Amino acid sequence: IEKNGSNNNSVAIKLINGDNSFVFTGDAEREEEEDILDTGEVLKSTVLKVGHHGSDSSTSYPFLREVMPEYGVISVGTGNTYGHPTQEVLSRLRDAGVTVYRTDLQGDIICTSDGAEVTFRTAKNTAPQEGRKPDQEEKEYILNTNTMKFHAPGCS
């Protein structure tokens, strides 16, 4: 594990559901993508969760050639200060013929697989939703002042 460059410590996963597959690479950069390619694993997948929010340090041409996704999902905040996704990555995806879904443009992206095909639904969340506190249930605990440990009644 690298101490510098924690993006290259991202966990990469390939999820297979019947004829559909998904590759998730977290914030992996080109260097980690090369390591993934060196494993020799078959990476071809239906959907690629585009690495590092669409940063130009990820989703390299060699990686795209191996994954060959039909769809790419970019999780990125609207108006982020990093400028993600970059035009360079969007061009790579376009060159590879990938249909792109972006959270900054389309909001929530829900991809469903039945094992034969994938479907996408998007929902732009236009108004913030007020959070809801869980129901408060009153509980009783007993403090042992010698050990300073809490116990539930009936606990031995």
What is the predicted role of each segment?
Residues 12-14, 110, 140:
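Short, surface-exposed charged micro-motifs
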Residues 22-23, 110, 119, 149-151:
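General beta-strand recognition
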